[in-house]
Amino acid sequence: MATFDHPFLPNAGPPIRKMMLDAIGVASIEELYSDIPAQVRTNHPLKVDWLPSEQEVKSHLERVLAENKSASDMPIFLGGGIYNHYLPAAVKAILGRTEFQTSYTPYQAEISQGLLQSLFEFQSMIADLTQMDAVNSSLYDGSTALGEAARMASRATGRKKILVPRSLHPAKLSVLKNYTEPAGIGLETFMYDKETGGVSSADLQSKVDRDTAAVYCEVPSFFGILDQEVANVPSICHSRGALSIVGFDPISLGGLKPPGEYGADIVIAEGQSISTEMNFGGPALGIIGCRGENLIRQLPGRLIGMTTTLDGKEKAFSMVLQTREQHIRREKATSNICTNEALFAIGAAAYLSLLGPKGLRQLFESILVKTSYAIKMLSELPGVVVPRFTSPHYQEFVASFKGTKGTLARLNKSLLSNGVHGGKSLVKDFPELGESALFCVTETHSAEAIDKLRLLIEKLQEA
């Protein structure tokens, strides 16, 4: 029987090591590493002062982890794309089911009828929410969904210009550039109205031309603005042969008009808020849908459809469109998306099923009320301008600290040391807004947490 030199690495024993070297035709470890120059190798034993037991390692790691602070330890007013919503226990239980706990769609997918039906239900619910003809079975996240939408629009129109708002999340813009630049698609920015924070219709209309493939708008915007002007954008686009892409927040459609009702051609969203927790920023859930057969055939990824068994006696589900490059000729594919976010799509279906239309509306109204309460509380502070813009806000709002003492960075640091995570600084990405921050409020924020934020800012101003 072979003897092992290491309790956790049985292959480190000399007999097994020799067998492996013989199998690859190498005489020694030295010969195996001969391609690595001697001057860059470590030629002395590593100095390891601490050789702990398993118990000591566990205790050490627990002490290190105890220094972390989670959303359950302090109120977090940081949003900007990933949000602290309450995820029902039933959704977590479904996500943990062994039948679902993989983001991978089986290659013999029709064997997994339960998985396909769950994805079909997800597609159907999002299509109903948005009033789109088709929704795919998920993309990586909201940013990549926007990238795919831009390429869809360019293919469908044969044009090479996409208009995006100046208020677009900088990280989302960066991902969008990664998708458009290799395809020769140019991006142009249209401004937001300095008073309302919404779309500047005059600036937009001056930039939509016969080279424009699509215009992208968001409701709510990155600034949290519920912009009524977005409803007029599709008609502006269509009058010039362009498409309208609208970004939405799934929970907000519990109370807002669906994008399909005012003419959006393609919709995209980040579905993290209805499918999974913050998870340090990912993984998330990309949502994309569209109207019209021409655009449906340009959708990336997979579509799950409902059909019948061969004998026609039972309902069944199958993949009806698979335009990924692994399934069809590469030059005919719409995208190289591989493993998608099927697990979180199922989580979203479970979430929407649990809440239903009435529950989703109640949640939307709750967030709306708490957002208004936070705005009211902060607006009472001297030197703080809240909201920075006059439009209605949902879940997020911009606060200007131009009239207060000190910098926003100092304020956020002080808030954190007092057990509150402040808003996202906009100083670097939106210098035209001065010392401003984006604050986020969801159903998880109590009135006491909002009051604590106000009180701390007030005390820090007096210090």
Question: How would you label these PLM feature ranges?
Answer:
Residues 107-111, 115, 127-147:
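Short loop-beta-helix segment that forms the pyridoxal 5′-phosphate
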Residues 274-382, 387-390:
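Active-site C-terminal subdomain of aminotransferase-like
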Residues 8-9, 144-316, 399, 409-413, ...:
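Conserved PLP-enzyme active-site core in the AAT-like
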